[in-house]
Swiss-Prot record:
Residues bearing the modification Hydroxyproline: 71, 74
UniProt keyword annotations, A-Z: Developmental protein, Differentiation, Glycoprotein, Hydroxylation, Secreted, Signal
Annotated GO biological process: cell-cell signaling involved in cell fate commitment; cellular response to phosphate starvation; maintenance of root meristem identity; phloem development; regulation of cell differentiation; regulation of leaf senescence; regulation of reactive oxygen species metabolic process
One MF term in the entry's GO annotations: receptor serine/threonine kinase binding
InterPro entries (alphabetical): CLE14-like (IPR055317)
Similarity comment text for this entry: Belongs to the CLV3/ESR signal peptide family.
Chain positions carrying an annotated carbohydrate: 74
Keyword Glycoprotein: yes
Name of the protein in question: CLAVATA3/ESR (CLE)-related protein 14
Positions in coiled-coil regions: none
Residues making up the signal peptide according to the UniProt record: 1-26
Taxonomic placement: Eukaryota, Viridiplantae, Streptophyta, Embryophyta, Tracheophyta
Keyword Methyltransferase: no
Organism (species): Arabidopsis thaliana
Amino acid sequence: MKVWSQRLSFLIVMIFILAGLHSSSAGRKLPSMTTTEEFQRLSFDGKRILSEVTADKKYDRIYGASARLVPKGPNPLHNK
């Protein structure tokens, strides 16, 4: 019976300590962002940054890929 009373008193003391810690930190909350502020932070500005294109290079503006030169002649990998 003595062990039960010691455990019970320890449990009650721990509950009071944890409740005190919780109530003391409840007043310190970080300021939350409003939904408008969060949307503005996460929104996309709509601008695309494309690389500079010179007149001598062929460039596909839709896909943003350059037309590279393909080697002409027989492919040595297929000549086995």
